[in-house]
């Protein structure tokens, strides 16, 4: 069984904890089943701002006449917007993972962690333990309890940014 000083589950804000621990010379395991950067980089803050920017541009074209500008609105290619989001943000997560794989005192596990006791996790059939464990994982969109919402086709941020 691999043993570390610090074990961090979650590569969103948890990656900052893991990097700081490794920089302090502590042998650190960082476990993330998805791309590094967590919700903010991959499914929340950053991609939503890019989608909002596309919507803002579309709205400017639709309202151009108000400003005595001739422009024709031909629609939004949402798939192309999402392609741009992925093309912009995926390299950031991939670059982060590449840097972490080269970082002294840091081991990156790209799989799901399942706790077997309070200081040990199983990752793809391998057990890993540590003296200190940080759990910084599990963010998911909140679907508010709005009457009738279950009767309509709604999207969460994860749904909207997926194909």
Regions picked out by a protein language model, each given a short descriptive name:
Residues 9-13, 33-34:
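Glycine-rich Rossmann-fold phosphate-binding loop(s) that bind the pyrophosphate
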Residues 1-11:
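Beta1/beta-strand and adjacent pyrophosphate-binding region of the FAD-binding site
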Residues 2-4, 20-26, 31-163:
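Glycine-rich flavin
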């Amino acid at each position: 069984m691999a043993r570390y000083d610090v074990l961090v589950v979650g590569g969103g804000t948890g990656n900052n904890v893991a990097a700081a621990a490794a920089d302090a010379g502590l042998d650190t395991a960082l476990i993330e089943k998805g791309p590094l950067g967590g919700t903010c980089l991959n499914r929340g803050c950053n991609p939503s701002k890019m989608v909002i920017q596309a919507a803002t541009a579309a709205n400017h074209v639709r309202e151009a006449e108000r400003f005595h500008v001739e422009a024709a609105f031909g629609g939004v290619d949402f798939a192309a917007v999402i392609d741009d989001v992925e093309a912009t943000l995926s390299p950031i997560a991939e670059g982060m993972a590449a840097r972490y794989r080269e970082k002294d005192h840091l081991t990156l596990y790209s799989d799901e962690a399942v706790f077997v006791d309070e200081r040990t996790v199983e990752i793809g059939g391998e057990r890993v333990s540590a003296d200190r464990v940080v759990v910084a994982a599990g963010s998911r969109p909140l679907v508010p309890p709005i009457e009738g919402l279950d009767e309509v086709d709604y999207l969460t941020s994860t749904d909207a940014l997926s194909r």
